[in-house]
């Protein structure tokens, strides 16, 4: 389950196969959208909550209120079913969409005030390697750090346009 600002998503996987996912970017609050979205996802996939082996949730970074609502919902469902629950960095999760990219993955989320939430990753032999911890960093500081990497750099996330417009990278 991922909740950030107005965006929310839920996905259901079996082994590594995506069975279904829901995404919304509405004006409704997270408390109004999350549980109906999860219920509809389970219904469409014909899966009962009791059949789920493990639940994962976004651990941020992101909006404190949105993360708190997502965590409370997932932990509540997991507790009720005695199901293990794991947290996933939102920044790391973004990188799993690009397992074939051979350069530097630079997920960025707008943290406001000229900063982005960021971490750096790269794939090596089928494994995602974390090069930096999740952090809040100014765009000029990130730009300076990225100059040290000779390989292609891919910006991804809701802060990518902001960074692209601000940075002077080759």
How should these model regions be labeled?
Residues 3-59:
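N-terminal beta-alpha supersecondary unit
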Residues 17, 84-170:
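Surface "functional belts" at beta-alpha junctions
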Residues 25-33, 64-68, 72, 89:
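Residues at secondary-structure transition points
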Residues 38, 73-77, 94-98:
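Buried hydrophobic packing segments
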Residues 43-50, 78-88:
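Phosphate-handling active-site elements
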Residues 56-85:
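DPxDG-like acidic metal-binding loop motif
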